[in-house]
Amino acid sequence: MSYRMNRRTYAETFGPTVGDRVRLADTELFIQVEKDYTTYGDEVKFGGGKVIRDGMGQSPISREGGAVDLVITNALILDWWGVVKADIGIKDGKIHKIGKAGNPYIQDRVDIIIGPSTEIIAGEGHIITAGGIDSHIHFICPQQIEIAIASGITTMIGGGTGPATGTNATTCTPGQWNIWMMLQAADAFPMNLGFLGKGNSAKPEGLIEQIKAGAMGLKLHEDWGTTPAAIDTCLSVADEYDVQVAIHTDTLNEAGFVENTIAAFKDRVIHTYHTEGAGGGHAPDIIKVCALKNVLPSSTNPTRPFTVNTLEEHLDMLMVCHHLDKNIPEDVAFAESRIRKETIAAEDILHDLGAFSAIASDSQAMGRVGEVIIRTWQTAHKMKVQRGILASEKKEVADNFRAKRYIAKYTINPAIMHGIADYVGSIEAGKLADICLWKPAMFGVKPEIVIKGGAIAWAQMGDPNASIPTPQPVYMRPMFGSFGGATSSTSLTFVSQEALDAEIPKKINLKTPAVAVSNTRNISKADMKLNEATPKIEVNPETYEVRADGELLTCEPAYVLPMTQRYFLF
């Protein structure tokens, strides 16, 4: 005998299904379920008197016989490839399958087997996303990693050695000794980590030795001298060893203008940091490079989105981060040349058009490591409010396309940029199970659970002395996946293929599995998921106005944003 449930009751019991819409936090963004992999009437749910019991939704099948280690039930997945309802099976720390979980002996279409060896996380009522990737990290202090993972970031890429003056300004881990030290330190954290060597050299030998030592890429920074000669040498070495190059260009235009830097690229692929320019780069027109097919452009989060406070805070940040002196007129002029409301406003729109492909933090060096995800969705909200629905959404009720475009900016696209998309960056079978669960009201602000390599690493947790898990104070705390050997067994360290072939991880006794980056040199802007636009960009050198394909790009600064004070009263 069948049983009918109305939509509200069904959603409250098993989560939303096809056609249902969910609001993202307190934004004006709504997503709508496109497909449901579960089976009506055969859904699995854990609890007293519910489905996942022996002989019912739980089979007697052993782990060796095919049962998975963990199932997230009735998950609403938001990823660049879709908005779907499904069960997620996890085995050996990797995503095993997205589909229908249960007991194949009594249920139809089961492709994820629940058995005696299977743990359950209730995904109903939650949005599930891939763990975020922050591809612009100054490794100034290890406490950044705690803040990052608590916000939903599970992979950090950048450079540094701690609060050294060089690291405070540049994302470089220079030389073999420093690279090995940082690789060894990485074992202590439930975080995928990769380090960029210093790329500033007109001769290749010093760059090659860093790649051989284990750098996953190279970083060119103007504070070390990003000249055309250094750019050319760095990209030549990267091409030879299949690693990515990130660049912070010459703000002062000392060694050349943006056209000279573009010429030095010679059509070779490169990741441009803070491509708008407030974080650094040819003043006032570095933003032009986002039109190039070989440039993979990202933003850093202090300019995301453009608000009434953006300009004022940037001047002070810049003086500190780049070791400038407010009493030296030239230093003040340097700072002021980088902060332009016109290009920051244009950056908002270029993100909405899909011309900027990624967002990262620039942690403690003009960026906030715990706000990559928040700032991304605030930008999406601001653009929805100011620009309306996107052209591709005109036939849709919800904001699915915009949501997919923006989530790609801190998940799959930085993974592709840096050659790690085989391992992380999306909810897909075979990838590391780095997964965030969000209550819709808290989406993008405070994750409920952060799963790292199949283990719960951080989670919202109440008083440990309470009789149940929920009494106040409830806040993000490290869980068992963040301790002991679990930190290394559930994470990855990214290195060059050259270092892996030379068995550097074994030589320096790394506990975290090391994997090589790949496919970094034969990609282009066209490979950036939903963020591949290459409009012709023009910048007026006197007014700083930005035009894309002849259209003036301008918008008002936001006076109020969602995902702010109401979420952070405590």
UniProtKB/Swiss-Prot annotation:
Subcellular localization, as worded in the UniProt entry: Cytoplasm
Cofactor section: Ni cation
Keywords assigned by UniProt, alphabetized: Cytoplasm, Hydrolase, Metal-binding, Nickel
Alphabetized GO MF terms: nickel cation binding; urease activity
Amino-acid positions noted as binding substrate in the UniProt annotation, renumbered to this chain: 221
Keyword Hydrolase: yes
InterPro entries: Amidohydro-rel, Metal-dep_hydrolase_composite, Metal_Hydrolase, Urease_alpha_N_dom, Urease_alpha_subunit, Urease_AS, Urease_asu, Urease_asu_c
Urease domain span: 131-570
Positions that bind Ni(2+) 1: 136, 138, 219, 362
GO annotation terms (biological process): urea catabolic process
A GO CC term assigned to this protein in UniProt: cytoplasm
Chain coiled-coil ranges: none
Pathway named in the protein's UniProt entry: Nitrogen metabolism; urea degradation; CO(2) and NH(3) from urea (urease route): step 1/1
Residues binding Ni(2+) 2, per UniProt: 219, 248, 274
Superkingdom, natural source: Bacteria
Cofactor comment: Binds 2 nickel ions per subunit.
Catalyzed reactions: urea + 2 H2O + H(+) = hydrogencarbonate + 2 NH4(+)
Catalytic residues (UniProt): 322
EC nos: 3.5.1.5
Family: Belongs to the metallo-dependent hydrolases superfamily. Urease alpha subunit family.
SUBUNIT field: Heterotrimer of UreA (gamma), UreB (beta) and UreC (alpha) subunits. Three heterotrimers associate to form the active enzyme.
Name of the protein described by the UniProt record: Urease subunit alpha
Gene source species: Trichodesmium erythraeum (strain IMS101)
Top-level taxonomy: Bacteria, Bacillati, Cyanobacteriota, Cyanophyceae, Oscillatoriophycideae
GN (gene name): ureC
